[in-house]
């Protein structure tokens, strides 16, 4: 009877032993982190629609590493670093998530779908009533972006790479995804993964950060509304959205797909297209967000994240 090579029979274990202690430790850490994300999503501490599929994807991708025919380590989920057309077409017939990643994630389509869904939930009435207050709040939200650029540059990243990393500070996942594709495509995977981990952990830790940073006497202040918000007619909101979309696309063409998607969602909301509204605000938004979590999870491959060219981002 021939001896059974368990390392070959169970390749997940075999690749763990053959990959070196650094990579093996990273795989174990990411598996444990994935399990933690699943638990925190189940408890409702983090957003379950993103964190549960993301955590399960992290577990599966780091446990399911195998030895490919050419002797390298790989998986049967996807390869985000493919650029050759022939290799990409061959891989799309083998790796089951490669078509989803290539046709929706790496070209920004899934980000546009999410923005479209967000648009259906967005009431532009406050922006109409208080445009300057809205701009001020937006600038405050982007403070982290401006502060991160010089720090990233000091770590050796180029200006475009620094700008892509800095977008994480704006706490806008789809915008991070879209910007990294435009400015630093070679860092797209680690930037996107770090961004959504940061957003999820910030969401879960936000109440504790508020208690830590804001004195109790300020937290006890009750907000008083001096006057009731003005109710704008739907046609005013629709016209405002169309004009604002045109202006923003004219000023910032590189982000025009996101602007179009957002204001298309607003237009659906304000025009009374009930069936389209139900679809965009429901299945499209939640389905895209769920698949975003799945793809983010399987992109958390230890071998990919520990690449020397991407360590500085992580």
Feature map (PLM): residue ranges:
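Hydrophobic transmembrane alpha-helices of secondary-active transporters
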Residues: 102-128, 265-268, 285-307
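Transmembrane alpha-helix boundary signature
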Residues: 63-98, 119-128, 150-159, 303-304
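N-terminal alpha-helical transmembrane segments of multi-pass membrane transport
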Residues: 1-82, 92
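Hydrophobic mid-bilayer segments of alpha-helices in multi-pass membrane transport proteins
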Residues: 29-32, 48-60, 112-114, 192, ...
